[in-house]
Amino acid sequence: VFGAGGGTSSYQEIEETDLIVMWGSNAREAHPIFFHHVLKGVHNGARMFAVDPRRSSTAAWADVWLGIDVGSDIALANAVGREIISQGLTNDEFIAAATEGFDVYAEVVDDYTLDRATEITGVPGDVIKQLAHEYATAETAQLCWTLGITEHHNATDNVLALINLSLLTGHIGRYGSGLVPVRGQNNVQGGGDMGALPNKLPGFQDVENPDLRGRFEAVWGAEIPAKAGRHISLMHESMDEGILRCLFVLGENPMQSEADSGEMRHRLEGLEFMVVQDIFLTATAELADVVLPAAGWGETDGTYTSSERRVQRVRKVIDPPGDARDDIEILCDLARAMGHDWETPTAEQAWDEMRALSPLHGGMSYARLEDMGGIQWPCPDEGSDGSLFLHGRLWERPVTTRRAPFHGVDHAPPIDELTEEFPTRLTTGRRLDSYNTGVQSGRYASPRRIAGSIDLSPEDGATLGVDEGDRVKVTSRRGSLEAPVRFDRSLRPGLVFMSIHFPDQTDVNALTLDAWDPKSGTAEFKATAVRVEAVS
């Protein structure tokens, strides 16, 4: 919608806004540092809404919790939009001057009455109405989301439905109001910024634009493919079809992090050749033909970029152990082994080459990053101090650049349908003390650790006739596993939760579905149909 893949606001604004909406985000556990900024906002008087199927530890801080049914976010967002329009709460001046496509959007959301939305989402109509009125009438508001929005087969449409609300109300492009997609893990933002995307060059520049491509080719001395590459789910399809036969995996554990892990194992084992470059011998590395030991955090120089677009320096403090080496050294050695005359640059030299090609980063020298304690892009030159928020251009009159488009999107239920055979909805996520597939965090003890359990509502536990700690069998259309029961009063009957952190004990991705969003390639980790049975 806006041209670059980053949040529009800064954490400072979260602390000073009037209203915070946490939608599909259990930031209290998954992004605890970010949530400190949210709590500062709450303590400074901000109202807070939480939209989440579970009454999570984040939702517990909210003034209002909307206990949405899994996979019904678009229906809820469209109903909020309809209520704002029907009650005359839209920012008409902003819509007329800075957006396009409003009439088509209004026609789409007109079908999402409060009654229909309640039927689809399970959220009472008066609560939907309250969210609509408070969001529309707040002087400033921040709309935040994470993987509860993006790990669905219609992830992109989910995001578009939320962006529509900011355009309706003018909560974009000005201090205190914006959109905050909190990234899934450390430096995901930085990876995207650097072009670790199949359709973008560094700085979110379109790889299919010949003029942009030509600038990079002139510096790199190589021809860049004119077509965008495959996102991860298309790569899976290419493995299935025998088109993709070799894989180079850097810092990823797809054997345990991808949906439908049984099928993923089949794909990886069917490759002709696989290289894994990582700091640990992951389950994926155990399947590799070659493992290249890489240096970790504290063993390399470079930068990280946070969800507020802030680029910060990281510094090497110790040498990597054993045969482990810096990623740059490994990649340059590989290039030389393949016949290319590559020098091995320092991290700063690699960064300077990138920022010379990316207008978002042009003014971010290492010296300035250190002196300023980090800089938020865009920072086009050394006369710029970066940008607290994005898209202030939408408040210029007249708007001389591209207007922000509305997108009319419709509700589509989860692919994995609930049936008599699979009557329970499983959703997955994170816990406070653990990290992703547990390769790093599983190596130390924690008094807060909740291992590979399945969380049930007490009501479902009573129906199954199980007590806390008893083992149950969880079966989906793809696989099954056993796990101990943990009762969680934040869950409603019919909804169960498992974390992603303990695949060696309870491989939750043996259950999940490899149905993916055609636009983003993200699999539907959040909505699996399962059957839960007591183990005798």
Model-derived features: where do they sit?
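Short, basic and Ser/Thr-rich N-terminal targeting/leader segments
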Residues: 173-175, 420-422, 526
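Flexible, surface-exposed loop regions and adjacent strand-edge segments
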Residues: 197-199
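Catalytic alpha/beta core of large soluble enzyme barrels
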Residues: 292-293, 508, 515-517
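Short flexible/disordered coil segments
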Residues: 201-216, 414-421
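Cofactor-pocket helix-loop regions in the catalytic cores of large enzyme subunits
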Residues: 1-187, 193-194, 206-386, 394, ...
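Long, compositionally biased stretches
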Residues: 375-456, 463-511, 533-535
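Long, low-complexity intrinsically disordered regions
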Residues: 517-536
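Glycine-rich, charged/polar anion/phosphate-binding loops
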Residues: 7, 128-130, 231-235, 407-413, ...
